[in-house]
């Protein structure tokens, strides 16, 4: 309720979601003088986002998330949202670093590449654990994801997701091997796809930038379109 009050003081409208219905009386009291704040008691991960967005103008998401839903919630907006302008969320600091990581670093992973196709990511502020009571076991950070239309264009969002998943299937294996396994390609097909995307034969997935992964996904999409035996 505290965050919602602050948002209501500066925003025209605030649509808040809370999963715990036991908080209804507390929030009713806390937000009694905030007529522009509307609280829906529902698990946001089960909300029909497309239906919700049909009723909304472009918006910003602000949240202090339970850490266990951070990735699925962020990916909902990355994969489904048409109107989110930005996400400003507090997350574990190691998760924030993964959101913002560069290719080839230990923090760089599938979620980094997934986010990068739609949004830029930056750490706005680090929040040490001593700022909370009771003191948690981890530090936190406020991270901002800013959505940009066609930030990294791809021919198929699904093929990009499949390519990212394949790239990080196993960090110990080459991307060629991962493509063979994930896309059911012959080794020759995998090599041809890598060559067409200007990716070295022995490259590992975690060394490719999101733009390189997008190029590779377009090549793989063209193979699918030509009805090469790659399962959908």
Predicted regions located by residue number:
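S-adenosyl-L-methionine
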Residues: 175, 204, 220-222
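Amphipathic alpha-helical segments that form the core helices of the histone-fold
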Residues: 195-202, 213-219
């Amino acid at each position: 309720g505290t965050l919602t009050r602050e948002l209501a003081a500066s925003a025209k409208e605030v649509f808040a979601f809370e999963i715990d219905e036991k908080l209804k009386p507390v929030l009713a009291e806390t937000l009694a003088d905030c007529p522009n704040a509307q609280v829906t008691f529902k698990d946001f991960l089960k909300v029909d986002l497309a239906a919700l967005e049909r009723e909304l103008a472009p918006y910003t998401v602000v949240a202090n998330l339970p850490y266990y839903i951070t990735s699925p919630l962020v990916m909902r907006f990355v994969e489904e949202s048409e109107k989110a302008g930005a996400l400003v969320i507090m997350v574990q600091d190691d998760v924030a670093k993964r959101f913002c990581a560069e290719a080839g670093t230990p923090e760089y992973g599938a979620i980094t590449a997934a986010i990068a196709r739609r949004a830029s990511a930056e750490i706005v502020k680090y929040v040490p654990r001593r700022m909370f009571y009771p003191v948690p076991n981890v530090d936190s950070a406020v991270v901002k994801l800013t959505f940009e239309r066609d930030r990294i264009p791809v021919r198929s969002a699904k093929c990009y997701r499949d390519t990212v998943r394949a790239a990080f299937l196993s960090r110990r294996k080459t991307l060629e091997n991962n493509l063979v396994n994930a896309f059911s390609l012959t080794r020759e097909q995998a090599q041809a796809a890598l060559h067409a995307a200007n990716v070295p034969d022995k490259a590992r997935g975690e060394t490719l930038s999101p733009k390189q992964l997008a190029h590779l996904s377009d090549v793989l999409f063209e193979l699918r379109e030509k009805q090469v035996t790659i399962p959908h």
